[in-house]
Amino acid sequence: MDYTLTRIDPNGENDRYPLQKQEIVTDPLEKHVYQNVYMGKLEHALHDMVNWGRKNSLWPFNFGLSCCYVEMTTSFTAVHDVARFGSEVIRASPRQADFMVVAGTCFTKMAPVVQRLYDQMLEPKWVISMGACANSGGMYDIYSVVQGVDKFLPVDVYIPGCPPRPEAYMQALLLLQESIGKERRPLSWVVNDQGVYRANMQSERDRKNAERIAVTNLRTPDEI
């Protein structure tokens, strides 16, 4: 599996996160497995254990911009029960949150605030872009709206829709958990190389393209 190496920028030398240097590399643990089977397998097991703990205890940052935030909070109700995925602990401080959900329209005046809040989050951290406005500006193709939060933030998961349903938000959580389970991060802060290896995840459109083309009997709206 191919991995994307993104180096952390602790000194703030890069003005925008998407402009950081990225390389397409292989799994960094594979070479250790071949050099030393025992230590390589042990390190692989440690990474899997740490990733398991991270992906099953994701604390969201309580931050919303527009109507998509209403759909996000709906997933915390008893009907949908997002607590099943370990993401019900809403944090009011970015320093205690694991991932940020940019839900709604991001205006140019709000963009510096969003980026500052993201900078205050501790590593490891992730970003979910929720809704058409956060993904690409939506129907607001005007000077005052940022045409996609990925212009200044590294987005991990995109949720389409205007607004998306709570089920879409929960699916995004599952996709984020799948991505976190394949990450390769330093197991300790006492390390030299602060490289972060993230698996290049295939989009849901491409992954389910063949399955959707093969469908011959379409369901009626009442059956969906």
Swiss-Prot record:
Stated role: NDH-1 shuttles electrons from NADH, via FMN and iron-sulfur (Fe-S) centers, to quinones in the respiratory chain. The immediate electron acceptor for the enzyme in this species is believed to be ubiquinone. Couples the redox reaction to proton translocation (for every two electrons transferred, four hydrogen ions are translocated across the cytoplasmic membrane), and thus conserves the redox energy in a proton gradient.
Organism: Erwinia tasmaniensis (strain DSM 17950 / CFBP 7177 / CIP 109463 / NCPPB 4357 / Et1/99)
Family named by the database record: Belongs to the complex I 20 kDa subunit family.
Membrane topology annotation: Peripheral membrane protein
Name this protein carries in UniProt: NADH-quinone oxidoreductase subunit B
Alphabetic keyword roster: 4Fe-4S, Cell inner membrane, Cell membrane, Iron, Iron-sulfur, Membrane, Metal-binding, NAD, Quinone, Translocase, Transport, Ubiquinone
Reactions catalysed according to its record: a quinone + NADH + 5 H(+)(in) = a quinol + NAD(+) + 4 H(+)(out)
KW 4Fe-4S (keyword) present: yes
E.C. number: 7.1.1.-
One cellular-component annotation, GO: plasma membrane
Note describing how the cofactor binds: Binds 1 [4Fe-4S] cluster.
Gene3D superfamilies: 3.40.50.12280
Enzyme class, broadest EC rank: translocase
A Pfam entry, by short name: Oxidored_q6
Cell location: Cell inner membrane
GO biological process, one term: aerobic respiration
InterPro entries reported for this sequence: NADH_UbQ_OxRdtase-like_20kDa, NADH_UQ_OxRdtase_20Kd_su
Chief place of localization: membrane
Residues the record lists as binding [4Fe-4S] cluster: 67-68, 133, 162
Lineage of origin: Bacteria, Pseudomonadati, Pseudomonadota, Gammaproteobacteria, Enterobacterales
Cofactors demanded by this protein: [4Fe-4S] cluster
GO molecular function, one term: iron ion binding
Subunit organization: NDH-1 is composed of 13 different subunits. Subunits NuoB, CD, E, F, and G constitute the peripheral sector of the complex.
